[in-house]
Amino acid sequence: MKISPSLMCMDLLKFKEQIEFIDNHADYFHIDIMDGHFVPNLTLSPFFVSQVKKLASKPLDCHLMVTRPQDYIAQLARAGADFITLHPETINGQAFRLIDEIRRHGMKVGLILNPETPVEAMKYYIHKADKITVMTVDPGFAGQPFIPEMLDKVAELKAWREREGLEYEIEVDGSCNQATYEKLMAAGADVFIVGTSGLFNHAENIDEAWRIMTAQILAAKSEVQPHAKTA
């Protein structure tokens, strides 16, 4: 199981300490960039990405919750992003061009589905994705309740990947925590984006918070594995 902490949930007063710890323990950094239009919130920025890059060696995954993603690609490449993750709703009419532009800048491509957006919405370019993320909450704010219907979408993406012989990772964003780990693993998730309930609220000290999170994930995995063997 891969872990991608959401930096909009971190303690910014402990920026250096937490970035360095995450870099030593996680698989990705998840960086939410919102414009106040596509979602009603403003969060992180290309400048923030550039500051994380000074301390980090693990891949920086920039989730663009913006109306005009084309305005951010070159900026984020200069800032040091490794992935750019796009919503189908914002790239219709230019999906292939933007995906090609991301690759020309040497970055990988992520696609992300809002709860109401079907997998079918990206069927003509799903094969171009390195990673596909399922939003299991409505986008824009941390700490929202899990939407259980999204388990079917995770399973659908796993089945699609197997049927078409694709290699994208399946990632989950929203309320990844002790209550949902086992269900998400069983459905086929490969990567958890962890935020307030999954990591940062466990303890003030990130080392202790990480220990608690890891124990919870291992416990969930131990429950999933026996079922996988008998399937």
Residue positions per predicted region:
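Hydrophobic faces of well-ordered beta-strands that scaffold small-molecule active sites
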Residues: 3-7, 29-31, 52, 60-64, ...
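Conserved, mostly hydrophobic/aromatic
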Residues: 15, 22, 32, 76, ...
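Catalytic cores of alpha/beta
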Residues: 17-19, 70-78, 117-129, 175-192
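N-terminal active-site wall of soluble small-molecule enzyme domains
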Residues: 31-101
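Glycine/Thr-rich beta-alpha phosphate-binding loop at enzyme active sites
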Residues: 35-43, 47, 115, 123-155, ...
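Alpha-helix-loop-beta-strand connector modules within alpha/beta enzyme cores
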Residues: 42-62, 101-110, 150-170, 212-224
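C-terminal helical cap(s) of enzyme catalytic domains, especially alpha/beta-barrels
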Residues: 102, 185, 199-231
